[in-house]
C-alpha cells in the first residue's frame, strides 16, 4: 500500500511523516520521501537553489521520481509492504504547474503525460491544509527569495492541491494542519491502519 503525505511548505507534513514511522511501527512501514537522497535528488535541490530553467527543473523532479520508484517504492510494494512517502506525484502536479505556467500550455496535462504508463498512483494521500500566512510564519520564510516559498506561489499551490482533491476525492484525506500535531498523528495514523488492514483483507479473499 502506498500512502503519500502532501501539503505546502510549513503545513506540518514533514512532522507528521516523521512521526508516522514510530506510530505505525507494528506495521513495519517503509518511510521515504521525494526528492530522494541520491545524486538525482541533490540535483533537484541544487536546481531549486539556483533557479534553474523551469522545464529542466521539472524533468529533474521526474527523474528523481523514477529512481525513487525503482529503488524504493516498487520493491517494497512487491513485498506487500506499507510505503509512506513525504511528497510524491501530487507535489509535481501543483508546484511545477506554478513554475511552468506561461511556459507550457496546460502544464498539469503535460506533467501527467510525462508520468503516464510508468508511475504508481497512491492508494491514500493525506493532505495537510493550512492558511498560507501560517505556513510562512512556521517556516520563517515570509518574503523568501526561493520561488517555492513565496506567498503568491504557495497560494496558487494550495489552490491547485484543492483542484486535485476535487478530481479524485476518494484518494484524499484532508486534515487541518493547524490542529495539535498529536491529534493529526492519531487521525492520520488510524486512517492508514484502517486502509492497510482493509486492503489486506481484500487480498486474502481474492
UniProtKB/Swiss-Prot annotation:
Sorted UniProt keywords: ATP-binding, Kinase, Nucleotide biosynthesis, Nucleotide-binding, Transferase
Protein name as it appears in the record: Probable thymidylate kinase
Catalysed reaction, written as an equation: dTMP + ATP = dTDP + ADP
CC per GO annotation: cytoplasm
Annotated binding of ATP, by residue: 7-14
Keyword Nucleotide-binding: yes
Source organism superkingdom: Archaea
Entry similarity comment: Belongs to the thymidylate kinase family.
Pfam family, one: Thymidylate_kin
Keyword Kinase: yes
InterPro entries with a match to the protein in the record: P-loop_NTPase (IPR027417), Thymidylate_kin-like_dom (IPR039430), Thymidylate_kinase (IPR018094)
Gene designation: tmk
A GO BP annotation: dTTP biosynthetic process
EC code: 2.7.4.9
GO molecular function, one term: ATP binding
Amino acid at each position: 500500500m502506498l500512502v503519500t503525505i502532501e501539503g505546502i511548505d510549513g503545513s506540518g507534513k514533514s512532522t507528521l511523516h516523521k512521526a508516522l514511522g514510530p506510530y505505525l511501527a507494528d506495521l513495519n512501514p517503509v518511510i521515504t520521501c521525494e526528492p530522494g537522497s541520491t545524486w538525482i535528488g541533490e540535483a533537484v535541490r541544487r536546481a531549486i537553489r539556483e533557479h534553474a530553467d523551469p522545464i529542466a527543473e521539472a524533468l529533474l523532479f521526474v527523474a528523481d521520481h523514477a529512481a525513487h520508484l525503482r529503488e524504493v517504492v516498487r520493491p517494497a510494494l512487491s513485498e506487500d509492504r506499507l510505503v509512506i512517502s513525504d511528497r510524491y506525484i501530487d507535489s509535481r502536479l501543483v508546484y511545477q504547474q506554478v513554475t511552468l505556467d506561461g511556459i507550457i500550455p496546460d502544464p498539469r496535462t503535460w506533467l501527467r503525460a510525462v508520468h503516464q504508463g510508468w508511475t504508481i498512483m497512491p492508494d491514500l494521500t493525506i493532505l495537510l491544509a493550512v492558511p498560507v500566512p501560517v505556513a510562512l510564519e512556521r517556516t520563517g520564510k515570509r518574503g523568501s527569495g526561493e520561488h517555492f516559498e513565496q506567498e503568491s506561489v504557495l497560494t496558487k499551490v494550495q489552490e491547485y492541491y484543492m483542484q486535485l482533491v476535487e478530481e479524485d476525492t476518494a484518494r484524499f484525506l484532508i486534515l487541518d494542519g493547524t490542529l495539535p500535531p498529536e491529534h493529526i498523528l492519531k487521525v492520520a495514523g488510524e486512517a492508514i491502519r484502517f486502509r492497510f488492514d482493509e486492503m489486506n483483507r481484500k487480498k486474502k479473499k481474492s
